[in-house]
Amino acid sequence: MAIPKKLRLFTLYVDGTNHIGKIPSVTLPKVTRKTEDYQGGGMQGAVAVDLGLDGGALDASMVVGGVVEELILKYGGDIDEMRLRFVGEIYSGGTSSLMEVEMRGRITEIDPGEAKQGDDTNHTYAIKNTYYKLSVDDKALLEIDLLNFIYKRDGKNLYPDRIVSALGLGG
């Protein structure tokens, strides 16, 4: 029986700066599709028609131990100003793999939590991303770039070139 690979170690880079030891947890994007049920005449049931990504599909958050001024100063920046790179070791039964999640976006919320003398002080940052890329052992599994009309799965862009070109989108 194979044991699933579990996250053993991680760090988060923000604009190239490693924040190892400062960030106890990161909530990575819950990538979700927006669908609408459609049932035409003669169909036994409804099918989910894919309408792209849900609003908030690339949202992330991080919990930061204490006050980190450079992160506070990034609040409310340009739409894709901040670059984040989550790097983690996923491990199972003597086998390690490297998992990376690259994101671009901006901080939209800073929650300093409760201030209580003598207690741990964590700040939670909400991040709205425009770019997301998930890789395992340098293999890109999923890449989404909202500003450049890219939606790749296993390296293949799923948007047809002729549609992208006709709409005047993409790079």
Swiss-Prot record:
The keyword Endoplasmic reticulum does not apply. InterPro entries: Tail_tube. One of its GO terms (cellular component) is virus tail, tube. Keywords: Viral contractile tail ejection system, Viral genome ejection through host cell envelope, Viral penetration into host cytoplasm, Viral tail protein, Viral tail tube protein, Virion, Virus entry into host cell. It is found in: Virion. GO terms for biological process: symbiont genome ejection through host cell envelope, contractile tail mechanism. Transmembrane segments: none annotated. It comes from the Viruses. Coiled coil: none annotated. Forms the virus tail tube. This is Major tail tube protein. It comes from Serratia phage KSP20.
